[in-house]
Amino acid sequence: MKILVLGATGRTGRLFIHKALEEGHSVTAYVRNPDKARALLGTHPNLTITPGDLNDTERLAAASAGQDVMASLLGQKATVREFLHSTFLQERLPLIMQTVTGAGVKRCVLLSAYGVGDTVRTASLPMRLVCKVIMHGIFTDKVKADALVAEYQPYISRAHPGR
């Protein structure tokens, strides 16, 4: 399978890529900083590191061409500002989805978090407080971004790890 990974140099992205390569998949890591990506990800015959910005639709479309799956493992930096208010995914995810599906990608996996959307109902009281108070900005951004890309069903699968 050919997999395009966004958020490749983050902790989850690195783990995902190493597992995908271990299982024999071809991976394209779309990254802002190729030198950083090479240092973090190393080299592998099935790994392609493609430089680009999430707002550069032409470059993202070119990286998406021929891919079977796009895995968005994007996340916000854990800063006080992001915890209080974030629009990172709301601003980027609709454009990303339009671009990659327009380039022919048929399946998109979006990393979310346990406590976002319907999953908050199954969380313990302390976890719900964390979701609603401490992580409010980041989780609100994820919920709003999900709503903005809902039109792309059935292309989207969401992962809510952490339970």
Language model segments and positions:
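NAD(P)H-binding glycine-rich loop region in Rossmannoid oxidoreductase-like domains
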Residues: L15, R38-L95, T99-G102
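Conserved beta-loop-beta element that borders a ligand/cofactor-binding pocket
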Residues: D146-R163
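Conserved beta-strand segments of alpha/beta enzyme cores
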Residues: S26, N46-T48, Y155-S157
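Active-site segment of SDR-like NAD(P)-dependent oxidoreductases
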Residues: K77, Y114-V116, R163
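Conserved hydrophobic beta-strands of the Rossmann-like cofactor-binding core
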Residues: I3-V5, M70, C108
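Conserved Rossmann-fold NAD(P)-dependent oxidoreductase catalytic core, especially the SDR/UDP-sugar
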Residues: S26-T28, P34, E91-G137, E151, ...
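N-terminal Rossmann NAD(P)H-binding glycine-rich loop of SDR-like oxidoreductase domains
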Residues: I3-H25
